[in-house]
Amino acid sequence: ESGFSTFGHSDDTINSSYKSWFSKDKFNEDNIYSNTQVKSLAISNGKATHVNVEHNGQSYSVAVEKVILASGSLNTPKILLNSGYKNKHLGQHLKLHPVSGVAGKFSDLQNPWAGSMQGIYSDDNLFRKDNYGYLLEGLPMHPSLFFPFFPNNQDNFADFISSYNYWSGSIVLTSDTSSGSIINKNPQHLWKYNLNNFDHGNLLHGIENLVKANFLAGAEEIMVATSPTMHWKRESNEDIESFIGKVRKVRNEPFRILLGSAHQMGTARIHPN
């Protein structure tokens, strides 16, 4: 049993990041700073000379020889913009690989938090239309990942919680044609992203296939991460095709489908063109 591997692993026998990269014989832990935010880089003659940071509310300027800026697609553009860099692509072209999920409840224990974090994978529809589509993947369902995607479940909440170990989850990971952007505000920047109808169609197609897969696997109940939550129960005698028909009619509207982001990409292009 690997436990809640989604949030790290306490077993010293595996090659975790602490063992591979941050072991005491390889890395000086005094060089890691918590409660610290990088605000900008000081640039002189085209070279970064200092990193301007805020640590516990105090501002500092740290002299550097080299800088590797690896703050992710959501934060790197703001640091570069605040450092004086200008590029028409900077902060644009945000891709998120939008994700939504389906869960199935089974009569046998699933223990969705245990074992391999991703044991199911299908790329049959990765290039569904115009070289864009989606992946189907297994989901490591820690409670903090599972319950927020189904906040409008109408069942008794205590019963829903107690049934957790019988649920199995999976996601649709969409290769998006949609694009977002970074809005550079101080002190906190914002992110803007709207899912277009093309990507919404691919997402719904993937959700439909996950519903079918759970049904064929014998699920007693199936939930779709919409708002309100769409919930099918075998005991209700609702025809599964009727339920799938309702899924197909879900419109591309704000907050109608609960979405996550698998990966954030594309906002720090270097080439000016």
Predicted regions and their residues:
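Conserved redox-cofactor binding core of oxidoreductases
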Residues: 1-40, 44, 221-257
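Generic recognition of stable, solvent-exposed alpha-helical segments in well-folded globular domains
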Residues: 16-20, 33, 62-63, 71-78, ...
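Generic, well-ordered alpha-helical scaffold segments in large soluble proteins
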Residues: 24, 28, 70, 82, ...
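Hydrophobic/aromatic beta-strand patches that form the interior of the parallel beta-sheet core
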Residues: 33, 68, 168-170
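Glycine-rich loop(s) and the adjacent beta-strand/alpha-helix scaffold that form part
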Residues: 36, 41, 50-121
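Extended, folded domain segments that form the structural surfaces/walls around functional sites
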Residues: 76-82, 213, 221-228
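FAD cofactor-binding and catalytic pocket of flavoenzymes
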Residues: 87-214, 221, 245, 253-267, ...
